[in-house]
Amino acid sequence: MLPAPLRGAATLLAVLALAALLTTVRHNASAYLTGVWDTGSQTLVYGRIHQMEQGQYAPGGFLGVYTDDWSDDTNRALFRDDTPTDAAAFHPYTHQSGLQGWLFGRVNRLLRHRLPDGLARETALYWLNSTLFYAAELLVALAVWEEFGPLAAAFGFASVLLAPWLQRGMKDLYWCLWTWLLPLLAALWLCHCTRVRGKTPRGCWPLVAAACMVRCMCGFEFITTFLILCEIPLCYAAAKAYFVRRDPHGALVWLGRTVGAGVSALGGVTAA
């Protein structure tokens, strides 16, 4: 049997490979075949990517647009056609940090060396976003498998494959649906490490904070939902300790960890 670190690395590689395969086979990177939604918000990311593409900078590094109307497709066209723009025309969107704009802007600049065509780079960014979402969902499915068995994991992941909203939305460069799952994944990892080691490693608390911070830096929308997702695995562990194992003390310990995770999550939100 492989050592635990090697097993973990092999599992992660397998998850990424399967996620990439699903993105390719199900055409999630194609706006034509699987559609898009909420193009108005995505415009902010296209504006930021194009700003970085032009070598322009604005204080704060926020998302933004080069037009007064966010609802049209102009900023996307500016990016895809590599149209020269006036730096003074950029209107920053300062309601969030805009981490996704910086991330995709960096990736786009790397892609330019191999993909000079704007449409090809857009498809590559969609492919990356969708692959990360599938990878996050597969990791959740593995956690469900470990606790409830393969049938529950299969049904759960099938709901992702069959959900039109997710199939269309996972490519969206503004919403970045994979970041919605980061707080849940951090909490699941905390629970896993605690069960394996018998105590919670100190590094799990800043991991929870970092997961919430990254999500909030991509937008504060639905933050209460993400915080609830972060607490669900720990609340389940507390309930299992009390009702299944008949261990009131163990349940209290898990409730304490739930509070700790909540404090860490709020710290991440505040930092964002």
Where are these regions (language model features)?
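Start-transfer (signal-anchor) and selected internal transmembrane alpha helices
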Residues: 1-24
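Short hydrophobic/aromatic helix or loop-helix immediately within or flanking a transmembrane segment
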Residues: 79-123
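Aromatic- and kink-enriched transmembrane "portal" helix at the membrane-lumen/periplasm boundary
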Residues: 118-126, 156-182, 212-217
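Transmembrane-helix motifs of polytopic, lipid-linked glycan transferases
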Residues: 123-152
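Membrane-interface transmembrane helices that cradle and orient dolichyl/undecaprenyl
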Residues: 186-203, 237-241
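Membrane-interface alpha helices of multi-pass inner-membrane proteins
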Residues: 203-222, 226, 261-267
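Transmembrane-embedded, aromatic-rich helix segments that form part
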Residues: 221-237
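Hydrophobic alpha-helical membrane-interfacial segments at the cytosolic entry of transmembrane helices
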Residues: 249-272
